[in-house]
Amino acid sequence: MGIAGTFIFMIVIGAAIGAVTNHLAIQMLFRPYKAYYLFGKRVPFTPGLIPRRRDELAKQMGLMVVNHLLTPEGIKKRLVSDAAKTQALRVGEQLIQKLSLSEVTVKEALEKAGMKRPEKAADAWISSWTDDKLHELFRQYGDQSLKELVPIEVQEKLEEKIPMISGYILSRSVRYFESDEGKIRLGNMIDDFLKERGMLGSMVQLFLGNSSLADRVLPELLKFLRNEETNKLLSDLLKNEWGKLREYTFNEADEKWNAKALIFSLKRRVLQAFSTAPFFNNTIGTLTVRYESELTQQMLPALLDKLLEGISSNLESVLKRLRLEEIVKEQVDQFPVERLEEMVLSISKKEFKMITYLGGLLGGIIGAIQALFVILF
């Protein structure tokens, strides 16, 4: 073989070795996919680099995601950004617009969600809650007197109103006894009074007659009711009773007048008058339209701020509980090596070819240098 043939032959051999070596090295990143054994011993370089280091790769990828990609700081920064808030507001407004078109009642929506008879449940909850609060108030303030419980300003205003109250009582009494019903009632009272007096009453009835006596008593009664001294007398009586009432503790008032039962009875009447049933019979659309301005301008922004604030403050603990590194590791472990190889080769196919060609070029250069040494020495 001549000098030129030797030179070309060694360049070709070197280039082929370099190209094949690099191509084989690239293939050995992924292949073989599993280990092969010969005489009970594992064949070297099986499985390929990535399949063999798969567990370590999955673990490192999980740590990389947690420590460098999905960090609490990065997510918080994204959550509090103006773009995120604007997007969240837009989504919320779209939801409100959608709800405003709904013909479903609140009751129907809750029943679809699994709550049976929501209006009854709401009334029962309110009743139970108010009972608990009232019992708590009774325990807390049962031994305190009314003057300790009622503010001084309120007591003073009530005391100032006593003359007005007594005047109102007397004026209503005058109007009643001037009416036909009042006159009849007064006549009946006089008749009953005389009957209880036996013979003396019969004698009075004999001389005057019931109607005549009622006609004589009524003007005097009205005169008495219109008298300022009567008003003052009634005011003084009311003030004295008010003064005594202020000294009563709630427990004493309960023993004397059954105050707790009266309060609970009043509570039941109020709750019956203000049942939640009409609210639950409203359609969601009606309620949304009625409060649309408050929902979009006040409640939605405030709710989003609270929601984002709550998420941000608890984000770190939530991410720790999620254990993202384990999730990433599990997903990488389950990901087929064949699919991973296909993805990497499809992305870096051109670069891998260039590496193969570079191996051939370097092998050719080495072959040329070797040919020079062979020819010269």
Curated annotation (Swiss-Prot):
Cleavable signal peptide: none
Any one annotated GO CC term: plasma membrane
Keyword Cell membrane set for record: yes
Domain of life: Bacteria
Family note: Belongs to the UPF0754 family.
Chief place of localization: membrane
Protein name: UPF0754 membrane protein YheB
PANTHER family on file: UPF0754 MEMBRANE PROTEIN YHEB
